[in-house]
């Protein structure tokens, strides 16, 4: 709608690639935020970028590696999962789909963009970790540490978007609120 009013916002959508091995590059291009292009971009990412653009008055580049239904473990290395204390390591490494197998999205979608300068991260994930919510706090702390190390900045800001309440069919009604609580508790350590 009003995307054309913000010509200083640039967007880069990382293609969905699950990879067993680390990738160095991806096939994508920067786009100017227009009423047509924002519809294909992360809404959370765009609105956050628009807020930054309005507040700072400088160009803002947004990179979105996202895959709906992914687990946190897919965005981490196996080594990072193995070094996370106090979790069920077997469960954390039991993904069966491309977007839930440990380190596949880290290798295929995150590493290809780590050469770009970044000033922070926005995280909107957790719904697919409802069944192992008890490990989520520790995993999120490890993920943030890993990503900061990947970008070479141990203090890089990490923001998370609180998950929207939703009732998943056949789920324990407490599982999603417990993930939300785990995210909140992780903030004290990141």
For every predicted segment, state its role.
Residues 1-190:
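Cell-envelope and extracellular/periplasmic
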